[in-house]
């Protein structure tokens, strides 16, 4: 039930270099032989899409990237568009309706991560997984982050920290959050 070692050694995907494969193996294993729908944002050369296709033999897999790709991958549908453009995301959702796994390995810009999460999360199936890679970009200025202002409201890291507060609002002494679309 492991992601085949030959698949990720022969594919120079950064997921192997970053140690993501071992983590994904743990969390994705329950989906392995199911008929799932997987969306990956940010596909570069398609290496990770090939990994998902081989690991999830019964899955419908799609990938999106802002740059049009000059390759195709058997069993994978490719979309070209901006991950922060809700109209573009709507075309993907209209075709697939919902997803079991969504992986955001796109631009790593906080505003893009927040926009795509806000649009796509409501289309994640119950018990589905939404993964955002490389959240450390919240601390890197060129991605809209800050190494100094750790509470900068516009970073993806702080968006998710606040979301954790929002989902648990009823446990505060004096609740100051109201229910939200992520409940």
Go through each PLM region and give its residues.
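A short alpha-helical cap/connector motif
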Residues: 1-103, 107-132, 136-183
């Amino acid at each position: 039930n492991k992601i085949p070692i030959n698949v990720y050694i022969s594919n120079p995907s950064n997921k192997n270099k970053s140690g993501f494969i071992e983590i994904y193996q743990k969390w994705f294993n329950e989906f392995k032989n199911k008929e799932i729908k997987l969306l990956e944002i940010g596909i570069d050369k398609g290496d990770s899409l090939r990994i998902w296709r081989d690991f999830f033999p019964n899955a419908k897999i799609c990938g999106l990237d802002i740059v049009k790709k000059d390759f195709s991958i058997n069993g994978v549908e490719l979309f070209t568009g901006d991950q922060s453009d809700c109209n573009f995301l709507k075309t993907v959702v209209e075709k697939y309706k919902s997803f079991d796994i969504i992986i955001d390995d796109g631009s790593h810009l906080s505003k893009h991560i927040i926009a795509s999460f806000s649009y796509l999360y409501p289309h994640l199936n119950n018990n589905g997984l939404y993964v955002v890679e490389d959240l450390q970009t919240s601390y890197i200025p060129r991605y809209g982050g800050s190494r100094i202002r750790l509470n900068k409201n516009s970073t993806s890291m702080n968006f998710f920290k606040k979301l954790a507060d929002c989902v648990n609002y009823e446990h505060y002494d004096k609740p100051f959050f109201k229910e939200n679309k992520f409940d």
